[in-house]
Amino acid sequence: MGNCNRTQKPSSSSNNLEKPPQAAEFRRTAEPSLYGRYNCKCCWFADKNLITCSDHYLCLRCHQIMLRNSELCNICWKPLPTSIRVPLEASAPDL
């Protein structure tokens, strides 16, 4: 009935939901800043092994707790990163 040979275009709303997750950067020690050290924005204690989430840092423990509850961050309400990119860091100073 009607136009059976016509293909349907996917709706734009389904394209927004299927974006691949961004890889978060993992830092063993946070970069020094002008305003002091960086901490986990959730527990405020951890200052090592931090993951970047949109505009703040999360420790691995708080990140895993948030992922168990929801796919959204409790602080910024943006999707939590599900993959982690570990940059190569020198283990010894240059000679």
Swiss-Prot record:
Interacts with protein NP; this interaction probably directs the encapsidated genome to budding sites. Interacts (via RING domain) with polymerase L; this interaction inhibits viral transcription and replication, Z partially blocks the product exit tunnel for the releasing nascent RNA product. Interacts with the glycoprotein complex; this interaction plays a role in virion budding. Interacts with host eIF4E; this interaction results in eIF4E reduced affinity for its substrate, the 5'-m7 G cap structure. One of its GO terms (biological process) is viral budding from plasma membrane. Keywords: Host cell membrane, Host cytoplasm, Host membrane, Host-virus interaction, Lipoprotein, Membrane, Metal-binding, Myristate, Viral budding, Viral budding via the host ESCRT complexes, Viral release from host cell, Virion, Zinc, Zinc-finger. This is RING finger protein Z. HAMAP family: ARENA_Z. Myristoylation is required for the role of RING finger protein Z in assembly and budding. It comes from Tacaribe virus (strain Franze-Fernandez). Belongs to the arenaviridae Z protein family. It is found in: Virion; Host cytoplasm, Host perinuclear region; Host cell membrane. Residues 1-25 are annotated as: Disordered. Late-budding domains (L domains) are short sequence motifs essential for viral particle budding. They recruit proteins of the host ESCRT machinery (Endosomal Sorting Complex Required for Transport) or ESCRT-associated proteins. GO terms for cellular component: host cell perinuclear region of cytoplasm; host cell plasma membrane; membrane; virion component. Plays a crucial role in virion assembly and budding. Expressed late in the virus life cycle, it acts as an inhibitor of viral transcription and RNA synthesis by interacting with the viral polymerase L. Presumably recruits the NP encapsidated genome to cellular membranes at budding sites via direct interaction with NP. Plays critical roles in the final steps of viral release by interacting with host TSG101, a member of the vacuolar protein-sorting pathway and using other cellular host proteins involved in vesicle formation pathway. Residues 1-17 have a biased composition (Polar residues). It is a lipid-anchor. Inhibition of host myristoylation by the compound DDD85646 leads to proteasomal degradation of protein Z (and not lysosomal), strong inhibition of Z-mediated assembly and budding, and reduced levels of viral replication and transcription.
